[in-house]
Amino acid sequence: MSTVVSEGRNGGNERYSPQDDVSKELPDINGLSLEETMGIPSFDRLPSPTPRYFGSCKWFNVSKGYGFVIDDNTGEDLFVHQSNLNMQGFRSLDEGERVSYYIQERSNGKGKEAYAVSGEVEGQGLKGSRIHPLGRKKAVSLRCFRCGKFATHKAKGCPNVKTDAKVCYTCGSEEHVSSVCPERRRKHRPEQVAAEEAEAARLAQEEADRSSPEENERKDGKLVEQKETETADKAGK
């Protein structure tokens, strides 16, 4: 590399080298953590103080975003956090997935952790877990106890029932509630309903027979016979 001699500010000669400009442009990342160097391009970073290690994922909790990898050389369990995974979107590891990484001491002093985790080839993306947790904001269908429909609204703000009175959410009637709704009973317990209806019909028929003229005459005839028998018994005594 050539060196140029130029006149300095005080009239003296100064030695200039293009390497001087390069050294001025490179950021000083000595003593910075991994998170603090995330904004610095990878080609400007200093080489890692540790060699690249290889291992496989032991387990990974996709809901909490952390897990452990087993190092191939030592068999040691190394903590791994989702923020240190080289992948886009939802970051996770699949059980048994092959990975490469660097090792450093954890900031809380509880063992070692793997960082800059990628595929077996450094910089290669990870496959990730096949399991994704449900989003907290995902719409959940609930049973509205006013209109009876499965929807995202609750009974208090039901848009389908305009009245303030209690209604049956099975058939929509205002005359009864769902617990005694005949439609619900017929739908969910057909055998029991059929037995109850048969018993009710039998009782109604007995009541009708008791009130019919034929039944009254039959009862009157039995009373007459009973009185005659009682009279004959008294006369015989």
Curated annotation (Swiss-Prot):
InterPro entries, per the entry: CSD, CSP_DNA-bd, Lin-28_RNA-binding, NA-bd_OB-fold, Znf_CCHC, Znf_CCHC_sf
Domain CSD: 52-120
Disordered: region residues: 1-26, 180-237
Annotated binding of Zn(2+) 2, by residue: C168, C171, H176, C181
Listed GO biological process terms: cell fate specification; negative regulation of primary miRNA processing; pre-miRNA processing; regulation of cell fate specification; regulation of development, heterochronic; sex-chromosome dosage compensation
Gene Ontology cellular component annotations, sorted alphabetically: cytoplasm; nucleus
Domain of life of the organism encoding this protein: Eukaryota
MF terms in GO: enzyme binding; mRNA 3'-UTR binding; mRNA binding; mRNA CDS binding; pre-miRNA binding; primary miRNA binding; zinc ion binding
Zinc finger regions, CCHC-type: 143-160, 166-183
CDD domains the record matches: CSP_CDS
Keywords per UniProt: Cytoplasm, Developmental protein, Metal-binding, Repeat, Zinc, Zinc-finger
Cross-referenced PROSITE patterns: CSD_2, ZF_CCHC
Family, similarity comment: Belongs to the lin-28 family.
Protein name: Protein lin-28
Natural source organism: Caenorhabditis briggsae
Lineage: Eukaryota, Metazoa, Ecdysozoa, Nematoda, Chromadorea
